[in-house]
Swiss-Prot record:
Pfam families: HTH_WhiA, LAGLIDADG_WhiA, WhiA_N. Keywords: Cell cycle, Cell division, DNA-binding. This is Probable cell division protein WhiA. It comes from Caldicellulosiruptor saccharolyticus (strain ATCC 43494 / DSM 8903 / Tp8T 6331). GO terms for biological process: cell division; regulation of sporulation.
Length: 325
């Protein structure tokens, strides 16, 4: 089972069940996974799901919320041979009008009630209803990419109006939801791992939340280790390059004027550098007659580098200066 399917299975068992929350959830299910029909003034509707737990959750909402017993059909998905489509049908009935009234999906004209299949603010006035709406919306048209690969939560909307309504609900929880047009649909999405964790918390997918947090921790540790290794590698390369440069300069000095012509303090460190090519600056410093720290050793080696540079310019005969520290 994918991460997204697992999260949906969990949320399906935790739908908020107060009267107002049921209406918000049913409205989302019908809007994003359903169709409403009208024939001879009588309404009927159905909703289809690929997830059995989601279909069962919607079935129970209709039963508990409106005392309606729905018909259920199960068919093999023609697009995905291994999957089934679960369709929950509420047959034509005069009672269905009352349901649509409570969901704010109809409006009255002088002659009759006509379908107004758009989401209304009245459905999500309370914070609990907003949560129920997000639960049902996620179950109907949401998906989460495998967090091992990337952090991405999205909702596939048919209209810009629906996308903006969902975006507004998400922003009421301080989510930075964005909208992008994809072919003929509108996608509302979150890309930050922390925001997806917060969203899972709001809709009650706590097991999925913990799994995602564990993945985030492992990925962060892995990234930290990689950064540390890269940093250590860069420092090691820098140290090796500096050591090779020092050795090359000392050998050049030996061939030109001879190491013996260097001041005693530079002569001592030069010989140690040649003899212990793999030693660190700290180790070289500890081998001196009068031990020095890394900065002191580095200072003397820089002086040697400068002498070699002057000699390479040519025409300048190096004169042995007086000993200095």
């Amino acid at each position: 089972m994918s991460f997204s399917s697992s999260a949906k299975a969990e949320v399906s068992k935790k739908l908020l069940q107060t009267s107002c929350c049921r209406k918000a959830a049913i409205a989302a299910f019908l809007k994003f996974a359903g169709v409403i029909y009208k024939s001879e003034g009588i309404f009927s509707f159905k909703a289809s799901f690929e997830n059995a737990q989601t279909a069962r959750a919607y079935f129970l909402l209709m039963k508990n919320g409106f005392s309606k017993h729905c018909e259920v059909t199960i068919k093999k998905n023609s697009k995905l041979n291994k999957n089934y489509v679960y369709t929950i049908i509420l047959p034509p009935s005069t009672d269905n009008l009352q349901i649509l009234k409570e969901l704010h999906f109809v409006k009255k004209t002088s002659k009759e009630y006509i379908l107004s299949f758009s989401l209304k603010e009245e459905l999500v006035k309370k914070k609990c209803c907003k949560k129920a709406f997000l639960q049902a919306t996620f179950l109907s048209c949401g998906s989460i990419t495998n967090p091992e690969k990337m952090y991405h939560l999205e909702f596939d909307m048919k209209t810009k109006e629906d996308a903006e309504f969902l975006q507004k609900v998400l922003r009421s929880f301080e989510f930075e939801a964005k909208i992008v047009e994809r072919k003929s649909h509108y996608v509302v999405y979150l890309k930050e791992g922390e925001q997806i964790v917060d969203f899972l918390n709001i809709i009650g997918a706590h097991a999925a939340l913990l799994e995602l947090e564990n993945i985030r921790i492992v990925k962060e540790l892995r990234n930290n280790v990689n950064r540390l290794v890269n940093c250590e590698t860069a420092n090691l390369e820098k140290t090796i390059n500096a050591s090779m440069r020092h050795i090359e300069n000392i050998e050049f000095i030996e061939k030109t004027i001879g190491i013996d012509n260097l001041p005693e303090n530079l002569r001592e460190i030069a010989r140690l550098r040649i003899k212990y090519k793999d030693a660190s600056l700290k180790e070289l410093g500890s081998m001196l007659k009068n031990p020095l720290g890394k900065s002191g050793v580095n200072h003397r080696l820089r002086k040697i580098d400068k002498i070699a540079e002057e000699l390479r310019k040519g025409g300048i005969l190096y004169a042995k200066p007086s000993d200095e520290s």
